[in-house]
Every structure is written in C-alpha cells, then in structure tokens.
Amino acid sequence: MKLFAPSSASHAKVLDMLALRTTEIAYITKETRFLDNALSFMSGVVWVTEEVTYQEASRAADLICSGFDALAALLKKGTKGFLGEVVVYPDSDREGLIIPVKFNVDGETYLMCMLGRYFGYSHYMNQLHPYSTAIIRNKSKGKAYGVYNRVFLSLYKTTINTLKRNHKIDMICSVPARPGQEDRFKKIIEELASDNEIENLNASFNCISNYPIQKASSQMERESNVKDAFVLSNRIDGATVVLIDDIVTTGSTLKACIRELKAKGAGEVICIVLGINQLGGTYWSSDAPELYCQDCGNKMKMMVNSNDGSFFYSCFGPNCRGVSFREAKRRIQTQVECRIDVTEKDYIL
C-alpha cells in the first residue's frame, strides 16, 4: 500500500481552511510514509517515535520526540529542532535537541548522537539550510575554511557533557585523515580531551590507505574502499571511546573505525556527528524554490562570511549585488506561497 497523503491538494486545502501560509504550519505524524511525503513541502514536520535507526535518521523530520506530551513540553521550552541547526541558524536563541540514533555495525547496535541534518547538493533544501552550508564551507578549502570550528567545538562539548551523565568516557578520537591530508579535527580533539581529562587517541589512530573519494561510490564500494584502512597502534581494553565526525552518508567510514576500535579492545564506542546526510529531497513541484540574482538572472548560492560566519547569497558576478540571508528568506517564502497546485486530488491506495 502506498500513501499519497499529504498531497499538494490536501496541503492547499488545509492552508485555505486555516488561512495560513505553507511556512506557518507543521505536520505531526508517527507514520514514516506520511513523513516522507510531508518533507516535500517547506512546512514544519514533527515525527513522533520512541527510537530512531540510522536509516530513519537519513530522512529526518525537523523535530523528533517520543510522544505528544514530550512534544508539548518541548514547544513550551521553545525547542525548535536539532541542536546544531538551532545554534547555527541566524538570530536564533532557541533550544535544540541531541537525537540518539541506533547505528548497527555487524549486528551490534552503537549509540550515535545526531546534532543535525546535512542536505547535499541533490536535495532541494541544500541552498536553503544554513547548517548544511556551515558544515560544508567549514571543511572546504576557501575563505570560510574553519570559520565555524569554535561553534562546532561548542556543540561537541555540549554533547559530551550530556553523555557524561550516563557514561564514563575514557578516550576520544576523530575519523583519521587520509595519509598526507590535514587533520581538521586535531585542535578540536585536543581541546575536548583536555577539558574532559580523557585520553586523546588521535596520535595512535591512523589511516593507512589513501582510499578514493567516497562521494560517488555505492554502499558496497564504500565498504570495500575503507576495509582495513584504519589502524590503532595500542590496546584500549574495556575503554569507552567517543568517535567524532562531521558528515555521515552511508556510515561506512564510521563502521570501519568502530571495527578497529573494537578489535583493539574498546568496551563501548559512541559516535557524535554534526550531520547525517539526508536522502530523498524531491520537492513536491518541479519548480523548486531557488534564489536568482536581480542583476544578472543567474542562480545564487548561500555563502559564509569568512569574518563573522554570517550567511549571504551571491551569484559571483563581478558587478552583482549579494543578498542578505534575511532578504533571501523573505523572497523564498514568497515563492513558496505562490506555487501550491490546487488541482491535484488525494488518493490512498
């Protein structure tokens, strides 16, 4: 049975009945198929669930909670979504959530702390999501490289402090960089280890294979590429290790790291990730919301100011004007409100 609700027709009818805009409503559901459909609109989406698997986290709602009482409590506190997304969002002073995700490796379940979602280039939200832009610009060579390191460090710190309520953490490390590449997590891991008085494993945890870039690889290819790629030079019998990464796509790299840590005796491995790559990403209409330069007509991209980390849009034209995030948001919201198709009918088969 395939669920076609909510459709654009039902969406339009709800907006008309409530006299609201698309960006002023939120869908609440326990049904993952309904969730997938609801995510195709630029409305809020709340998923009510007792637990989240990694596969489910790859199609995540804006807000995830365990029940309707929990949802009411979160809204009363002003909680708006994932911790990372809330912290990075411009002018935000809201609270955010760290979502525990069940990550399966060789039949064993590991705790993954999810701080937000990452929308890749194929997702319609890619150029509409400040957190995704912050993550990718921060790790890509360019003017904004590293500009969000302190912000991301604070997110990791908050998560570790939360974990320490129920876990005795002994060691910390990040996914090792390929041979000859810069370790982007070096200073972050050093500070986290020092602040929490735990052992820094990065010096003894290394990548020994210059495996190919994983972006275009399948799940099977990724697993094969990183097989035996990571080596820990010492035993860590019984230790609880925190493993840090930024963007997780298939999880193949994290799995390879966990296998090596466990092989060297780790009792428990807990992952903390800035964002889980979001699958799907098809907008309900072929006319997805995008921002175009008013000077030259070319598409604009969200960028990060290298001085203060603020967001803006640019088409990179030498004589064209950039657009502030606030103004871009206003224009995109106007586009969204004008594009609801009211001719489609609802069907549940």
Which residues does each PLM region occupy?
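Asp-based, Mg2+/Mn2+-dependent phosphohydrolase catalytic module
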Residues: 1-26, 31-97, 282-286
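Histidine/lysine/aspartate-rich catalytic loop segments that bind and position anionic ligands
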Residues: 2-5, 192-212
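PRPP/pyrophosphate-binding module of the type I phosphoribosyltransferase fold
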Residues: 17-24, 31-33, 37, 43-54, ...
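Short glycine-rich phosphate-binding loop at a beta-alpha junction
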Residues: 26, 167-178
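Active-site-facing substrate-recognition patch
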Residues: 86-171, 207-235
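Short cysteine-rich clusters marking metal-coordination/redox-active sites
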Residues: 293-296, 315
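Short linker/helix segments within small regulatory modules
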Residues: 303-314
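Short metal-binding segments enriched for Cys and/or His
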Residues: 317-346
